[in-house]
C-alpha cells in the first residue's frame, strides 16, 4: 500500500481536485483500490462524495482510534472509499499544538494497521492548507508528497517554505519522497509561462504534466463527478489522466 499526501501551504490551488481526480482515475482506469482521507476541515472532498452524514469522521481517528474499517465510507466511484472530515479538525489542531502529541501517533498507528490489514493499493490524504498538526500527521505517514501549485508569485514563493518543512519531517522519517510539484490551472499567458519556467528552475521536482484551466472543472464539482467521468475528453480530464500515468511511471522507476 502506498500513502500519498496532497499538500500546499495555500488554498485555492487545486489540492482537493487533485486528490479526488487522482483517486478516481487510479480506481476506474488502473483497477486500483483507493482510500481518500479528507484531512481538510473545510471537508470539500467529503461533501463531493456525500460523506457529510457518516457516523464517524477523521477527527475520531485521532482522538478515539478504533478498527480502521469502521471509518471508511463507500463513495459513488467504484473502488474509492473515503474517511470524511469535519470542522472538528480545527479543534484537533489546537489540542495537538498545545498539549497532546499522542494524537499524531494515534494517526500513525491507524495508518500502520491499515497498511498491514487492508486491501487498499493507495491511500490519498487531502491535507489542509498550511503546516498544521493534521498536515504534519499526514506527511509523516506518507511515502510520497504531491504539491499542487497554481503558477503565481504567492504560490511559488510558498513552495520553498513548504519543501523546507517537509525536509525537516524527512529527518525523522527518511522514507518520505517529494514526488513533485503539479502545476494546476495552467493557461496560455506570458506571466504563467514565465512563472512555470521559474518553478522548473527551483530545487524541487516538477511533473512534466500540467493541468489546464477549464470551466468544466467547476461544472464537474457542482455535478459531484470526477472530471474524467463528467467530461472525459476535456483538457483537464486528459491532463489528469496524463498526470496519473506520469506519477505511476515515476513510482515504478523509483521502486526498481
Q: How should these model regions be labeled?
A:
Residues 1-256:
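P-loop NTP-binding core
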Amino acid at each position: 500500500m502506498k500513502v500519498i499526501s496532497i499538500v500546499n501551504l495555500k488554498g485555492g490551488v487545486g489540492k482537493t481536485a487533485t486528490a479526488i481526480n487522482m483517486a478516481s482515475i487510479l480506481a476506474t482506469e488502473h483497477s486500483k483500490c483507493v482510500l481518500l482521507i479528507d484531512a481538510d476541515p473545510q471537508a470539500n472532498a467529503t461533501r463531493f462524495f456525500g460523506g457529510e452524514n457518516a457516523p464517524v469522521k477523521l477527527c475520531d481517528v485521532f482522538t478515539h482510534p478504533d478498527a480502521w474499517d469502521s471509518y471508511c465510507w463507500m463513495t459513488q466511484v467504484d473502488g474509492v472509499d473515503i474517511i470524511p472530515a469535519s470542522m472538528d479538525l480545527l479543534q484537533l489542531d489546537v489540542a495537538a499544538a498545545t498539549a497532546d502529541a499522542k494524537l499524531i501517533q494515534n494517526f500513525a498507528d491507524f495508518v500502520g494497521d491499515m497498511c498491514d490489514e487492508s486491501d487498499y493499493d493507495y491511500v490519498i490524504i487531502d491535507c489542509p492548507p498550511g503546516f498544521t498538526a493534521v498536515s504534519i500527521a499526514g506527511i509523516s505517514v506518507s511515502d510520497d508528497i504531491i504539491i499542487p501549485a497554481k503558477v503565481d508569485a504567492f504560490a511559488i514563493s510558498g513552495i520553498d517554505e513548504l519543501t523546507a518543512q517537509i525536509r525537516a519531517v524527512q529527518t525523522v522519517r527518511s522514507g518520505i519522497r517529494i514526488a513533485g510539484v503539479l502545476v494546476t490551472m495552467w493557461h496560455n499567458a506570458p506571466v504563467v509561462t514565465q512563472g512555470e519556467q521559474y518553478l522548473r528552475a527551483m530545487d524541487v521536482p516538477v511533473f512534466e504534466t500540467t493541468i489546464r484551466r477549464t470551466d468544466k472543472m467547476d461544472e464537474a464539482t457542482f455535478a459531484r463527478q470526477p472530471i474524467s467521468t463528467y467530461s472525459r475528453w476535456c483538457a483537464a480530464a486528459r491532463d489528469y489522466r496524463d498526470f496519473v500515468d506520469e506519477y505511476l511511471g515515476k513510482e515504478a522507476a523509483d521502486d526498481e
